[in-house]
Amino acid sequence: MEIADTVSSILAHKNSTEVWSTTRDVTVFEAIGLMSGKNIGALPVMKDGLVVGIVTERDYMNNVVLKGRSSKATAVGEIMTCEVVTVGPSANVVACLQMMTDKSIRHLPVIEDGRLVGIVSIGDLVRRIISAQGALISQLEGYVMRASPV
């Protein structure tokens, strides 16, 4: 495992290969229920097989809760983020983390051949980097211990 890993390596190690999504006309209440039930923080919003938006916990808090709106009477299309930042499976993990930091986002839908194939979170990326750094430290410790004339 290397820090130079790609998004595809993260998707390959995720517990589920299923990609959850929603549509614009679904109520926020239903979308939040799905997110809660699947323990995820965002849902790509789909129309005709294409990602047209993303709805996140932050969208819910800022556009429903803090505005006193009803989640049962509000459609996802009314609160979703329309300008979706996406990546391909070959995107570098560190580059994705930098992009998320620069744009203050926590989820990246993964698109391959125009099709949604997954989503990675900032947590997925951080876990991968920490794991890669741990492996590198172990390798260096092994090298130092073998090279030491103790």
Q: Locations of the language-model features?
A:
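Tandem CBS (Cystathionine beta-synthase) repeat/Bateman regulatory domains
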Residues: 1-150
